[in-house]
């Protein structure tokens, strides 16, 4: 062949590879309401920045006639590109080719991208839409999953890993997303489960459809497996871009600085009255969080799961911060098993990637009851104090109202390593509430006597000043000054240099 023929051959092969399973399969994918792998990548990345790797890789399976079913790329599109000018690596299962099933060869494509991301200190994004393991390959496909899981684990805490479930994700395929830092799902399109509805019916005789078993709502509100539930694929991909704007590319960098035009001295007068005078009345903690952040913008994570704790990202004077807060508007803000898990994992993520932690505390205690005790609230609650105590990033705590007992301790208290502890004048820092304490200490007293003692207890302990006298509270502040006080504390601790004793790893109470 001459040069022109060689070039023409390449162009034809390249065009064919770009079609994945072919025009018919692409039309079928569109008819199901889903984009193709390449369309997803093009929407996710900066325009024209995608560089595809291993486009002509193909499987080597000869079982069950597979040697006659060769599709270039082998149902996987992988490579690298940029998001907001920053390097990222990405791989997307191509459902138009072999149903996006995982083979030995396309698993190797994923592992190559994972290793490149790790070497170059860049995030890796997985776009999942797969029928699962390629049955025709048997154990070779399973070994491919194992290699991916291994790379997920090695990269954990070194580079951000993000997964989007944009179709089916069943069986062993579920474990890679769960080993990553954040999972996105699409309403009524994404499904994750270890065993599908048919197997569930056979084994347990339960009648359940795939949406109830493993849909986006189930995993965002009940299991806590997924972090974000989006309405469309487009919203999902844009949300991934937004999430990355708060994160560094790796654990050796800081998150990108965003120039701030929002006055750091801005007072928020509404905070003077947002907390009810009755200490037992609820309020929405986000009415405190949002107004004090840059441009009053809060990017919430896991908004539908364990609503008694609020987590997410924001910025203070241009710097990314992780927010952890008790939510008095839900279960009075008590800590339970799910809330403990939710908070602890987020705290550890922020610590991995040098993101300072701001804690808004209003917690009356841990949720009582046999269900919580029997399911291990002691063990789960300990995860929060472990995560906070282990974290070496700047840690700033603001007590807005209640801070009682063991729950006060675990929510980034001064003795567990917080750098700056602030409190509002109405903060109550005590072993427990006045009524509970008096009922224990003076159980034989009359109701009238108890009321007098309750008033005495409240005057002595239902305020922040006893803790401030002992240095457990660094400063009592007016609510309106919250934004500037947080910015000041963050700037003071910006160059914090702390390291824990050398160890292989700790033994967190999992």
Regions found by a protein language model. Give the residues of each.
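Ligand-binding clefts of soluble mixed alpha/beta catalytic domains
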Residues: 1-510
